[in-house]
Amino acid sequence: MEKIIIDAEQFQRTISRISHQIIEKHSSLDNLVLVGIKRRGAEIAEMLQSRIAELAQTELPLMALDITFYRDDLHLDHQDPVYTGVESQIDITGKNVILIDDVLFTGRTIRAALDALLDFGRATRIELVILVDRGHRELPIRADYVGKNIPTARTEQVQVRTQFYDGMNQVVLIRAKDE
């Protein structure tokens, strides 16, 4: 069973609110770099980049990060992993990085992303943007900017759908069939 928990209008308002929060928190945007975790985190990063440009008249550098080979669960996947590379590689040394992903669950994706970021330099600071925080952390990771906190059961799934990949912007909660 599927339940829409963020519709298209709420999705855009959430992107706008997070953009405002980023601008308010940083006295200057000159040293900021947006890094989106592929796939949907990268698309959300593009949305934030666009909205921040509208609000602050400045376009932040953007990098899409593939964390495939940094994951700690590669041995569980029986398919050969496909690395899609990094788009617009940026040296993040001395930069304030805003790391962006769609859903925060166990924290393992973010840990992998932090490991991957080290290959691009030593950032001054890394902040985390998450569209949906669903809880159930296995690692001590906390987001600096959260679109929406959605308490879930471990058996449920939170699926972020974006225009590029899914033809719409929304977030749905998918319950297991036996619940």
From Swiss-Prot:
One of its GO terms (molecular function) is uracil phosphoribosyltransferase activity. Its EC number is 2.4.2.9. The keyword Translocase does not apply. It catalyses: UMP + diphosphate = 5-phospho-alpha-D-ribose 1-diphosphate + uracil. It is an enzyme of class 2 (transferase). A motif (PRPP-binding) lies at residues 97-109. Keywords: Glycosyltransferase, Transcription, Transcription regulation, Transferase. HAMAP family: PyrR. Belongs to the purine/pyrimidine phosphoribosyltransferase family. PyrR subfamily. This is Bifunctional protein PyrR. The gene is pyrR.
